[in-house]
Amino acid sequence: MDLEAKVKKMGLGHEQGFGAPCLKCKEKCEGFELHFWRKICRNCKCGQEEHDVLLSNEEDRKVGKLFEDTKYTTLIAKLKSDGIPMYKRNVMILTNPVAAKKNVSINTVTYEWAPPVQNQALARQYMQMLPKEKQPVAGSEGAQYRKKQLAKQLPAHDQDPSKCHELSPKEVKEMEQFVKKYKSEALGVGDVKLPRDMNTQGPNKMYIPGGDRSTTTAVGAMEDKSAEHKRTQYSCYCCKLSMKEGDPAIYAERAGYDKLWHPACFVCSTCHELLVDMIYFWKNGKLYCGRHYCDSEKPRCAGCDELIFSNEYTQAENQNWHLKHFCCFDCDNILAGEIYVMVNDKPVCKPCYVKNHAVVCQGCHNAIDPEVQRVTYNNFSWHASTECFLCSCCSKCLIGQKFMPVEGMVFCSVECKKMMS
């Protein structure tokens, strides 16, 4: 498919998750409705990950596409119908007998994802070493956490041009080259092993604790492997604490066999969240999630959340923006050359600010213009004018004077306060 055809085919899938309730806003949100180019709900302004959207197949497609054309193709399967790669995530089901008064019942626990290891006991140990609220048990807080991190850490629009808004053919080509590069140079999947098993990794290479190199060792020289294992001390690359014997550890191939992590320490160096499904990006001695690796390579538009591949973009309020996306957060009007106010780190045009966000003057009961001086005390505000900031009893101007506040009123003296009480 040529670039022109790809551009024409692009769309944001606006029907996906339509009407899903917001888990954050509850009944305040009318239901999920994707904004035309922002990755948020038009009704409540929360992200799709904050809504109860059923995305299991879509997320599996996204991760499957991420692993396509990499060494991790064993983790994907191609659908017979359309050839789309699907992520073969490992689901672990544990059954535990529960003693009852008359008979024994079976308690089943399903993990929506588990490390793809042959030893289920090792996978179970791994799960137990994660914080309980982050264990992806079906229907639990941990499963919701995993779903949210899949959306945040691995945005589809960081790897698939068709998920982006109106890219030019040149931008599509640059993005495809960028994705190909990070797949070959940074992308990896952690592996769970017992630390003592690390000695068997690599061609005739032995792990040297605390070192940054490996040495070639003749097999015959290993007189007492078990004794060597007992003497070895392994420490976590993140927290520097030692690994307990028999506890599972994570290693990242791109980091080298001399580095191990506790399961709960295998986190992004920027957001410090667990790397979802142990999918990592390695750069300059640090682990990153997909989002923050891409942020370290390319500017990201604060409006549409997409990476910027154009040479022309704007910077404002310590953020980057596509020229067409530096818009009012409320009405989407372009703000270039216009007066705007930052509200919760989002730019809002002056008319929308006055209409939706401006504080109301206690004196005249009108909205206070963002460019006008004001007097604020606790949660109350006044125009800093001789017409508004007045004694609530005698109407004396209080600008530059001492005053006595009582809820939304101000007084120039005890006498005036008593007269109004």
From Swiss-Prot:
Entry's Gene Ontology cellular component terms: cytoplasm; focal adhesion
PET domain sequence ranges: 92-199
Region (Disordered): 133-164, 193-213
Composition-biased stretches (Basic and acidic residues): 155-164
Domain LIM zinc-binding: 234-297, 299-359, 362-421
Key words, A-Z: Cell junction, Cytoplasm, LIM domain, Metal-binding, Repeat, Zinc
Domain of life: Eukaryota
Pfam families noted in UniProt: LIM, PET
Subcellular location: Cytoplasm; Cell junction, Focal adhesion
Coiled coil: none
Cell inner membrane recorded as keyword: no
SUPFAM superfamilies assigned: Glucocorticoid receptor-like (DNA-binding domain)
GO process annotations (BP): negative regulation of cell population proliferation
GO molecular function: zinc ion binding
Function according to Swiss-Prot or TrEMBL: Scaffold protein that may play a role in cell adhesion, cell spreading and in the reorganization of the actin cytoskeleton. Plays a role in the regulation of cell proliferation. May act as a tumor suppressor.
Known partners and oligomeric status: Interacts via LIM domain 1 with ZYX. Interacts (via LIM domain 3) with ENAH and VASP. Interacts with ALKBH4, talin, actin, alpha-actinin, GRIP1 and PXN. Interacts (via LIM domain 2) with ACTL7A (via N-terminus). Heterodimer with ACTL7A; the heterodimer interacts with ENAH to form a heterotrimer.
Domain notes: The N-terminal and the C-terminal halves of the protein can associate with each other, thereby hindering interactions with ZYX.
Family: Belongs to the prickle / espinas / testin family.
Protein name as it appears in the record: Testin
